[in-house]
């Protein structure tokens, strides 16, 4: 089943206009917890928060805005963060709108430093149809992240590659599988002396509005930069062939479990000494990802960390 077809089915199942129901045959504990959705305003607007694994310190904060007609794509937005009530702390940050690669939708992205853990509130202000719109939501900031954080050593989990499967279909649920994304193990990539981009995703099973065609982004960037950077897709399911015929038969892959990922789509950049330099929960566009990768192709990046480029 192709990504587009599955995502269309998914949107039908959840009822994109009401966002209140889900498909029983793809439901599990993750779908109740991710993504975080705000209440729907009287005007019919809602925030879908893609980045829920937040901790004290600097974080990428990304969200989607929905209306009764679908995705809202607007520049010139502002988000205000309100700390737990007893701390009386406020942060105001401009938000950059990043179009997804299909150019029909996008994410609002900013970087923010949270000084305190606890329950935070936020307010998004934007202009839609010449009207000022304000949408409020809430989220939790933890002391530490659940998934590996920037600066952590990348977990060396044994992912499947072309060398240890009988059929390429065992590597991904996607309908188009690019062999270049399955040539190296995580261990081999880390030891190569090059930076590495790893995406954890199941292309045929995007479960929510924050999920997108991430593997296609990887293919696009791999074609452009694969001589200097390793690109790896790790399927989150261990048995993609069986899963195509039975939604309920899915078994999580060992790398997905070892990395302790609290939602279904993640992308990480690993520097040339095996440390995580960037992490992206939910979909990340090729524009945003490539912007981070350019550092490793500069003189500063190669001299400091990347002897093999």
PLM segments and residue spans:
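Short active-site neighborhood of thiol/selenol oxidoreductases, capturing the structured segment around
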Residues: 186-207
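Thiol-/selenol-based redox modules, centered on thioredoxin-like
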Residues: 145-150, 160-166, 272, 276-309
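Thioredoxin-like thiol-disulfide oxidoreductase module
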Residues: 236-264, 269-273, 295
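Typically the conserved alpha-helix immediately C-terminal to a functionally engaged Cys/Sec
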Residues: 208-225
């Amino acid at each position: 089943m192709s990504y587009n077809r599955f995502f269309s089915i998914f949107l039908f199942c959840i009822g994109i206009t009401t966002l209140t129901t889900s498909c029983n045959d793809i439901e599990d504990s993750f779908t109740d917890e991710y993504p975080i959705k705000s209440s729907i305003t009287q005007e019919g607007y809602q925030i879908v928060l893609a980045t829920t694994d937040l901790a004290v310190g600097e974080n990428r904060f990304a969200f989607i805005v929905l209306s009764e007609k679908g995705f809202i794509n607007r520049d010139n937005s502002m988000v205000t963060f309100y700390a737990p009530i007893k701390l009386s702390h406020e942060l105001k940050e401009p938000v950059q709108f990043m179009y997804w690669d299909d150019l029909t939708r996008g994410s609002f992205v900013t970087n923010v430093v949270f000084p305190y853990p606890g329950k935070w509130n936020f307010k998004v202000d934007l202009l839609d149809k010449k009207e000022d719109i304000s949408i409020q939501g809430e989220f939790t900031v933890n002391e530490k992240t659940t998934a590996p954080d920037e600066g952590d050593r990348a977990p060396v989990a044994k992912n499947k590659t072309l060398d240890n499967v009988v059929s390429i279909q065992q590597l991904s649920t996607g309908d188009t599988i690019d062999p270049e994304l399955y040539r190296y193990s995580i261990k081999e990539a880390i030891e190569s002396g090059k930076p590495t981009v790893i995406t954890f995703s199941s292309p045929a099973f995007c479960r929510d509005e924050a999920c997108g065609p991430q593997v296609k982004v990887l293919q696009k960037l791999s074609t452009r930069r694969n001589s200097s950077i390793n690109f790896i897709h790790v399927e989150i399911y261990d048995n993609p062939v069986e899963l195509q015929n039975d939604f309920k038969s899915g078994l999580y892959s060992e790398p997905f479990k070892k990395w302790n990922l609290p939602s279904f789509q993640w992308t990480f950049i690993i520097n040339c000494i095996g440390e995580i330099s960037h992490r992206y929960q939910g979909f990340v566009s090729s524009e945003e990802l490539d912007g981070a990768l350019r550092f490793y192709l500069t003189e500063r990046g190669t001299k400091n960390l990347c002897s093999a480029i």
